[in-house]
């Protein structure tokens, strides 16, 4: 099977809105994935479900083929992270680990998908595809990051990283395909930086994306030792962000800055909607 063709998901989760909360209505997982309890912990967003994805192996190995699928049905709100940074170990010559992440966000849903970075060990080889399908009136923040580590301190690097991000509106052709392919990279290529990341922010058309991009740029400027750039995506569909840093902690600060801006926008929009909802509510009989 081609590396670009996803296998049957070994993690398959579906989320629905029931009353004032989001719940899981499909929970299927197999080794190495583990899913324990999920939580409603955000007092400002009581509808939002927090999920921590775990792996029994704690790492990605040379010939792993892993597919995840997350489906958010109409009105669901989900925040997803992982148990910690995931190591990607050495692959035999001619082999590479393959991972697909399929994210489907339906009308009115909200997804915050921020897994911890991958740690690429010497001679690691990873092909990953992240496919985001997002309805026009849904919101999604999706991040991806990697760093490099040689436990022997000799400066050895990974063998290959083939990463593709696909973004599409619901049921339509891709409006963004972003690919990075590094094979046997030289140390000089990274210019002293060892941690790299990207983020895609999709918002409903009611938001001023150009103004949001400027807010992000201002937030990034306040983070030391972080190289960051934010750009508008094609057709004004969203915002794309790139990060380069010397350490992972600076990447995390950048991602936190994006999430903080998104949260402020979201809570502001909800506060503005509350008076209108109250004004149009029908009186009920005592």
Curated annotation (Swiss-Prot):
Would the keyword Cell inner membrane be found if you checked this record's keyword annotation?
A: no
Location of the protein in the cell? Cytoplasm
Top-level division of the source organism's lineage: Bacteria
Cite the Pfam families for this sequence.
Answer: UreD (PF01774)
Q: Which UniProt keywords apply?
A: Chaperone, Cytoplasm, Nickel insertion
- Principal localisation: cytoplasm
Give a GO cellular-component term.
cytoplasm
The question of whether Chaperone is a record keyword is answered with yes
Q: Which GO terms describe its molecular function?
A: nickel cation binding
Q: What does this protein do?
A: Required for maturation of urease via the functional incorporation of the urease nickel metallocenter.
PANTHER family, per this entry?
UREASE ACCESSORY PROTEIN D (PTHR33643:SF1)
Query: Assembly and partners?
Result: UreD, UreF and UreG form a complex that acts as a GTP-hydrolysis-dependent molecular chaperone, activating the urease apoprotein by helping to assemble the nickel containing metallocenter of UreC. The UreE protein probably delivers the nickel.
Family that this chain belongs to: Belongs to the UreD family.
Spell out the protein name for this chain: Urease accessory protein UreD 2
Native organism is Bradyrhizobium sp. (strain ORS 278)
């Amino acid at each position: 099977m081609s590396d670009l063709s996803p296998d049957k998901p070994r993690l398959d989760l579906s989320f629905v809105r029931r009353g004032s909360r989001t719940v899981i209505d499909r929970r299927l997982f197999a080794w190495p994935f583990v899913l324990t309890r999920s939580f409603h912990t955000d007092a400002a967003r009581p509808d939002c479900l927090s999920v921590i994805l775990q792996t029994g192996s704690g790492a990605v190995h040379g010939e792993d083929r892993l597919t995840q699928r997350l489906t958010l049905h109409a009105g669901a709100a989900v925040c997803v992270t992982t148990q910690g940074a995931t190591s990607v170990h050495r692959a035999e010559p001619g082999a590479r680990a393959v991972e697909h992440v399929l994210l489907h966000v339906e009308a009115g849903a909200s997804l915050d998908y921020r897994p911890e970075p991958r740690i690429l060990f010497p001679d690691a080889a990873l092909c990953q595809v992240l496919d985001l399908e997002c309805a026009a009136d849904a919101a999604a923040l999706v991040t991806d990051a990697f760093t490099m580590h040689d436990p022997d301190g000799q400066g050895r690097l990974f063998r290959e990283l083939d990463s593709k991000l696909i973004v599409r509106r619901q049921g339509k052709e891709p409006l963004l395909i972003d690919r990075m392919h590094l094979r046997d990279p030289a140390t000089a290529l990274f210019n002293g930086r060892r941690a790299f990341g990207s983020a895609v922010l999709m918002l409903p058309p009611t938001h001023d994306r150009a103004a949001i991009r400027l807010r992000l740029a201002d937030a990034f400027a306040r983070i030391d030792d972080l190289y960051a750039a934010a750009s508008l995506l094609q057709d004004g569909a969203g915002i794309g962000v790139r990060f380069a840093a010397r350490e992972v902690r600076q990447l995390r600060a950048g991602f936190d800055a994006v999430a903080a801006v998104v949260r402020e926008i979201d809570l502001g929009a909800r506060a503005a909607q509350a008076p209108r909802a109250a004004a149009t509510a029908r009186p009920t009989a005592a």
